[in-house]
A protein has these predicted regions:
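Charge-dense, extended regions
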Residues: 205-220
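Conserved catalytic cores of phosphodiester-cleaving nucleases, focusing on short active-site segments
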Residues: 38-40, 47-53
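Active-site metal-binding core of divalent-cation-utilizing nuclease and nuclease-like domains
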Residues: 24-34, 41-43
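Nuclease catalytic cores
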Residues: 6-10
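Catalytic cores of nucleic-acid endonucleases
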Residues: 1, 11, 19, 25, ...
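Residue-level detector of beta-strand structural context in well-folded domains
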Residues: 36-38, 142
C-alpha cells in the first residue's frame, strides 16, 4: 500500500509538470527502480527530480542475508552501495550474533527464536545528511519534491532557483521484519533510511502542488 500511495503521488507530480509543459514528449517516470523519478527541463536542458510522498517515505528498504558468518545484501544495487558506504554492513557485522533464521532448520524455528533475532538485529543509527546529498549527487539529482513540505535542493542549488536545502536528520533503521505471521520463519532482515521525525525540515516556500500558499518553483 505504501508503494502504491508513493507511486500515485509521483504520477500526480508528473501530471502537474506535464500540464505546464515541463515534461518532454515521450518521457516516463522512473518508478520503483534505481532511476531518478522525474526529469524536468530548464533552459533547454533536463534535470533530475526525486519525489517523495511525505516525510514518512523511506529512501530505499533493502533486504539483508547472513552467509558463512557474514552479513551482506540479497541484491546489490545503487542503494545498497550507498548503505555500504555509510557503514551499514560494518554496523550489522559488529553485532556478532548468529541469526536463528539462518542457523536452524526453518520449520523448526520457534516464536521465541524469532524474537531473539529481532532483539539482536534491530537498531537505529543516525546518518549524516551529507551522505544522502552525495548519494543523489552521484545520480546527478539535486532537487526533491516532498508531499506537504514542498520543493528543495539537495547537495546544492545548481540552477540558482533560490530553493531551501532539504536539511534534517536521517535515521537508518535495522529491522527483523515479519513477512507473514505463519509459518514463523517467514521474516527477513532489512535496512531502511528515513527522516528522523524528531527534527523535521522547515517547509519550503516552493511546491509543485502549490499547497498552503507555497509558490510553484521557478523552473519554467
Amino acid at each position: 500500500m505504501g508503494y502504491n500511495k508513493g507511486d500515485n503521488y509521483e504520477q500526480n507530480i508528473f501530471d502537474l509538470l506535464t500540464s505546464k509543459g515541463l515534461i518532454a514528449t515521450g518521457s516516463t517516470r522512473g518508478g520503483a527502480g534505481n532511476a531518478t523519478d522525474i526529469k524536468f527541463p530548464h533552459n533547454f536542458q533536463e534535470y533530475n527530480l526525486e519525489v517523495k510522498l511525505d516525510l514518512e517515505a523511506d529512501y530505499g528498504q533493502k533486504m539483508m542475508k547472513w552467509d558463512n558468518g557474514i552479513w551482506g545484501w540479497c541484491v546489490d544495487d545503487a542503494v545498497t552501495s550507498f548503505y555500504t558506504s555509510v557503514g551499514v554492513l560494518d554496523i550489522v557485522n559488529a553485532k556478532n550474533f548468529i541469526p536463528n533464521r539462518y542457523s536452524i532448520a526453518r520449520d523448526e524455528i520457534t516464536t521465541q527464536q524469532k524474537n531473539q533475532d529481532q532483539k539482536a538485529f534491530e537498531d537505529k543509527v543516525e546518518i549524516d545528511i551529507n551522505s544522502l546529498y552525495d548519494f543523489y549527487g552521484g545520480k546527478d539529482c539535486y532537487y526533491i519534491q516532498i508531499g506537504g513540505y514542498g520543493f528543495y535542493h539537495l547537495k546544492r542549488d545548481i540552477l540558482s532557483l533560490g530553493t531551501s536545502q532539504f536539511d534534517c536528520k536521517m535515521k537508518l533503521r535495522l529491522r527483523a521484519k515479519t513477512i507473514h505471521s505463519s509459518p514463523v520463519y517467514k521474516y527477513g532482515f532489512y535496512a531502511v533510511l528515513k527522516v528522523d521525525k524528531k527534527e523535521k525540515p522547515k517547509k519550503s516556500c516552493f511546491d509543485i502542488e502549490q499547497k498552503d500558499g507555497r509558490e510553484f518553483p521557478p523552473i519554467i
